[in-house]
From Swiss-Prot:
Cross-referenced HAMAP family: Endoribonucl_YbeY
Primary enzyme class: hydrolase
Superkingdom assignment: Bacteria
Record's protein name: Endoribonuclease YbeY
Localization of this protein: Cytoplasm
EC number, UniProt record: 3.1.-.-
Organism name: Hahella chejuensis (strain KCTC 2396)
Its biological purpose: Single strand-specific metallo-endoribonuclease involved in late-stage 70S ribosome quality control and in maturation of the 3' terminus of the 16S rRNA.
Similarity annotation: Belongs to the endoribonuclease YbeY family.
PANTHER family hit by this protein: ENDORIBONUCLEASE YBEY, CHLOROPLASTIC (PTHR46986:SF1)
Transmembrane segments: none
Molecular function (Gene Ontology), one example: zinc ion binding
């Protein structure tokens, strides 16, 4: 099982994660077997806002958008899909949530990769499964649990 990751940088932000980090985090979240391919595109707020408005009807930038690839009938390609991650939103959320930038970036890559593999968080039961898996994967990489509150971090 291998994952081929195409990294596209379309952001002016400084201090972006390295390609090696992005690939490591994407590989950590791969649940499917066989050879797979994914594109991770790092963008600024305007591109994220445009895509979020076009595909989700929300006229604001968002942290990560996932675009799963659907094989046409009779054709099997190894494509998982595309992730579009908005650098300024991820950096701002990390500060707001009192996380390191690396921890939040890892979480967003894992979150998006799970969406590409069919995980979702709209229904409570599905959200519990997805969030539990995200927590397991993020902590396996040495980061704190992504959904811990600031008070629970202070307590222990």
């Amino acid at each position: 099982m291998s994952l081929d990751v195409d990294i596209q940088i379309a952001s002016e932000e400084a201090d972006l994660p390295s390609e090696e980090q992005l690939i490591l985090w994407a590989q950590a979240a791969l649940r499917e077997t066989g050879d797979r391919e994914v594109t991770i595109r790092i963008v600024d707020a305007e591109e994220s806002r445009e895509l979020n408005a076009q595909y989700r009807g929300k006229d604001k930038p968002t942290n990560v958008l996932s675009f799963p690839f659907e094989n046409p009938p009779g054709l099997t390609l190894p494509l998982l899909g595309d992730l579009v991650i908005c650098a300024p939103v991820v950096f701002n959320e990390a500060v707001e949530q009192q996380k390191t930038a690396a921890a939040h970036w890892a979480h967003m890559v894992i979150h998006g990769m799970l969406h590409l593999q069919g995980y979702d968080h709209i229904i409570d039961e599905e959200a519990e499964v997805m969030e539990s898996l995200e927590t397991e994967l993020v902590t396996s990489l040495g980061f704190p649990p992504p959904y811990a509150t600031n008070s629970s971090l202070a307590e222990g």
